[in-house]
Swiss-Prot record:
Positions of the catalytic residues: D9, D129
Gene: hisA
Family matches, as InterPro entries: Aldolase_TIM, His_biosynth, Isoase_HisA-like, Isoase_HisA-like_bact, RibuloseP-bd_barrel
Subcellular location: Cytoplasm
Entry EC number(s): 5.3.1.16
GO cellular component annotations of the record: cytoplasm
Endpoints of the signal sequence: none
NCBIfam families: PRK13586.1
Catalysed reactions listed for this entry: 1-(5-phospho-beta-D-ribosyl)-5-[(5-phospho-beta-D-ribosylamino)methylideneamino]imidazole-4-carboxamide = 5-[(5-phospho-1-deoxy-D-ribulos-1-ylimino)methylamino]-1-(5-phospho-beta-D-ribosyl)imidazole-4-carboxamide
Protein name listed in UniProt: 1-(5-phosphoribosyl)-5-[(5-phosphoribosylamino)methylideneamino] imidazole-4-carboxamide isomerase
Similarity field: Belongs to the HisA/HisF family.
Natural source organism: Saccharolobus solfataricus (strain ATCC 35092 / DSM 1617 / JCM 11322 / P2)
SUPFAM superfamilies: Ribulose-phoshate binding barrel
Length: 232
């Protein structure tokens, strides 16, 4: 399924899948490099990697990202705690194809724009994280910012590579996607990706039909609830 992008979230050297981002919940999947190799050998050509420790300011897992980049994936996108030009350049130098930004876009736009200028628009994806209030979540999903539509408009102005819509309410729960996302998909310029709550093949079919290019999968994927997946 070429539209599926498996996610590997890394915390303290382990691949994990949290429930709504809460530390200590969900699954511990083991060595992230070994997991990435399994995914590659299963035929997945794209991968979504998040450094949870860097995002939370309690460390970084770049050494694992560096090794994952050597495996041979066609596409690697990385997010989590990228808050300065130097780190952005360092990750790109590892052959990461695109970097993912979220909070900084809405809290420090000048810094974000400087990073974009340094690494190029075509290497930047913005994750618009949101919940049932339909407002953008920032600062570790603890605060709410502007409405989703306004967030999309703000990002569209920069003509970046694309946008991920991340439905935090059901993230890691396998409880299903946000079906109202169809109203936002048509507004996005560039590559359209979705994450959060994907629980079945029918969810994936719906997202494809409303215009998403790629679907990022996590908990349901590793619980083998999606057709054709049997990785762990």
């Amino acid at each position: 399924m070429n539209e599926i992008i498996p996610s590997i979230d890394i915390s303290f050297g382990k691949a994990v899948k949290r429930i709504r981002g809460v530390r200590g919940t969900g699954l511990v999947l083991g060595n992230p490099i070994e997991l990435a190799n399994k995914l590659y050998n299963e035929g997945y050509s794209r991968i979504h990697v998040v450094d949870l420790d860097a995002a939370e300011g309690v460390g970084n897992n770049e050494m694992y990202i560096k090794e994952i980049c050597k495996i041979g994936f066609d596409w690697i996108q990385v997010g989590g705690g990228i808050r300065d030009v130097e780190k952005a350049k360092r990750l790109i130098s590892l052959d990461v194809n695109a970097l993912i930004f979220s909070t900084i876009v809405f809290t420090n736009f000048n810094l974000f724009y400087n990073i974009v200028r340094e690494i190029g628009n075509n290497r930047v994806i913005v994750s618009i994280d949101y919940d049932d209030t339909k407002r953008v979540l920032i600062s570790g999903w603890k605060e709410r910012s502007m409405e989703i539509i306004d967030g999309i408009k703000k990002v569209n102005e920069l003509e970046l590579l694309g946008i991920i819509l991340t439905y935090v309410t059901n993230e890691g729960t396998v409880k299903g996607i946000d079906y109202s996302v169809k109203d936002y998909a048509k507004l996005i310029r560039g590559v359209k990706e979705y994450a959060g709550g994907v629980s079945s093949d029918s969810d994936i079919t719906f997202l494809k039909n409303v215009g998403f290019d790629y679907i990022i999968v996590g908990m349901a994927f590793y619980l083998n609830k999606i057709r054709g997946t049997n990785v762990v």
